Amino acid sequence: MVLTVPVKGYFEEYCYFYVSDSTRHGLIIDPGAQADQLLDIIRDNGLVIEKILLTHGHFDHFGAVEKLREKLNCPVLAHEKADLFLLDPLMNLSRQCVGDMIIRDTVKFKDGDTIALDEAHSLRVIYTPGHTPDSVLLYNEKERIAFVGDTIFKESIGNYTFPGGNKDLLIQSIMERLFTLPDDTVLYSGHSEPTTVGAEKRFYGM
């Protein structure tokens, strides 16, 4: 089950809960702001959060991490290149927007790793640099879902002008890593309503 929660910090951003219906255990993906609201959802739905996952290291995707980590006592996972952003307020854009924010002590994953919730629920890491050098999507083949961060949105692509961004890499990631997923894969992004691989390919004339 996927729960979508819009959170409002400096930017509005979508945080996601990936939850087992049977056990109520779950993962939080990109908790950008409003930690108290997210904690209320966890309590009201009887959820047990095992891990916090980041699709990339911009502050609007990790703004609620520290409070959640303290309250939930769970690890925070990010790509092996994420410290370029998580430890640098200029790179993660917090200094320019809200004041310095950093995240330390994250567990690192890499392309191809599987992040397991239980035997029936897991997410595979697919490396998609371009928006940032640490950007990933988190994919479940059986359920045909992917949490794509800011790599792609409905009928648009991620920003590549921020520090570390690269237009050519972003387009390559979309074409070679994202658009090769099944057309019915639902894409959950950081700043737009869900779309599908097939819908985006059609939008771009493919």
Task: Identify the residue ranges that each predicted region occupies.
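Active-site HxH/HxHxD metal-binding segment of metal-dependent hydrolases
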Residues: 34-121, 203-206
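Conserved beta-strand hairpin/beta-sheet module of binuclear metal-dependent hydrolase folds
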Residues: 1-45, 137-149
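Short Gly/Pro-enriched turn/cap motifs at secondary-structure boundaries
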Residues: 6-8, 104-107, 127-129
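Active-site neighborhood of phospho(di)ester-bond hydrolases with catalytic His/Asp-centered motifs
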Residues: 28-29, 50-57, 76-80, 127-130, ...
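Metallo-beta-lactamase
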Residues: 122-206
